[in-house]
Curated annotation (Swiss-Prot):
Record's subcellular location: Cell membrane
Cysteine-cysteine disulfides: none
Signal sequence residues: 1-24
GO cellular component, one term: ATP-binding cassette (ABC) transporter complex
Protein name per its UniProtKB record: Cobalt transport protein CbiM
Species per Swiss-Prot/TrEMBL record: Acetoanaerobium sticklandii (strain ATCC 12662 / DSM 519 / JCM 1433 / CCUG 9281 / NCIMB 10654 / HF)
Gene Ontology biological process terms, A to Z: cobalamin biosynthetic process
Keyword terms, alphabetized: Cell membrane, Cobalamin biosynthesis, Cobalt, Cobalt transport, Ion transport, Membrane, Signal, Transmembrane, Transmembrane helix, Transport
An example molecular function term from Gene Ontology annotations: cobalt ion transmembrane transporter activity
InterPro entries assigned to the protein according to its UniProt record, in alphabetical order: CbiM (IPR018024), CbiM/NikMN (IPR002751)
Membrane topology: Multi-pass membrane protein
Main localisation: membrane
Subunit: Forms an energy-coupling factor (ECF) transporter complex composed of an ATP-binding protein (A component, CbiO), a transmembrane protein (T component, CbiQ) and 2 possible substrate-capture proteins (S components, CbiM and CbiN) of unknown stoichimetry.
Length: 241
């Protein structure tokens, strides 16, 4: 119990240190046309509903998982609030969704991501409410599902590599989707959607690849700490999804 309290305190401390003047999250308020903002919101809704159902099931079966859910949410909040300016209307930053995906599966991350993004929009002026659906879809839905599939595919062969790749891939896929969302909303005048997508991806790659690698390493460290706590009988990471 002592270890998880130390981890929780460390994450909370980092939240307090998160600069409130940091750039907006993936796509800033008003940067998407209303039609695209609505489309991404509608697409995201079923996953959010499914996520609430999954979280209820997890907490009903194991009430002590509430603390771990809170820790995962704080981890996402901190990492996704650390931003580097990238493309106009967007930024590069870790996503933090890999850890929760590995522990709880992808559906709960839709809810956790939604909550984190709302708090960032309202309290830190990161991103916005109109672009919430798009940001949830890229960071809290597609990213976690991509990370989950790679984790499940190789976890029995090499658990550490699976954790690292899941976190890294969840991060990178998020930015591929974000680039597509921006390209669909703002196609290039000459080369259309493909040209715009290529431009956004090219600029994102400069900062996002190193960030994704770093996130993979950090996620592996935190996961290993939780595994050590699991050995003390705190919870069973294998029965959360």
């Amino acid at each position: 119990m002592k270890k998880i309290k130390i981890i929780s305190f460390s994450v909370a401390y980092l939240i307090l240190l998160t600069p409130i003047y940091a750039s907006a999250m993936h796509i800033m308020e008003g940067f998407l046309p209303p039609l695209w903002a609505a489309i991404w919101s509608v697409i995201s809704l079923p996953f959010i509903v499914g996520g609430f159902s999954k979280i209820k099931k997890i907490t009903d079966e194991s009430p002590n998982m509430k603390l771990l859910l809170g820790l995962v949410g704080a981890f996402v909040f901190v990492l996704s609030a650390l931003k580097l300016p990238s493309v106009t209307g967007s930024t590069s930053h870790p996503t933090g969704v890999g850890l929760g995906t590995i522990i709880f599966g992808p559906l709960p991350m839709a809810v956790i991501g939604l909550i984190v993004l709302i708090f960032q929009a309202l309290l830190l002026a990161h991103g916005g409410i109109t672009t919430l659906g798009a940001n949830v879809f890229s960071m809290a839905i597609v990213g976690p599902f991509a990370g989950y599939f790679i984790f499940k595919a190789i976890k029995d062969k090499n658990r550490s590599l699976a954790v690292f790749l899941a976190a890294m891939l969840a991060d990178l896929i998020t930015y591929i989707v974000t680039s597509l969302q921006l390209a669909l909303a703002h196609p290039d005048a000459v080369n259309g959607i493909v040209g715009s997508f290529t431009k956004f991806m090219g600029i994102f790659a400069i900062t996002q690849i190193p960030l994704a690698i770093g996130e993979g390493i950090l996620t592996l460290i935190v996961y290993n700490l939780l595994v050590e706590y699991q050995k003390e009988g705190g919870f069973n990471l294998e029965k959360t999804h």
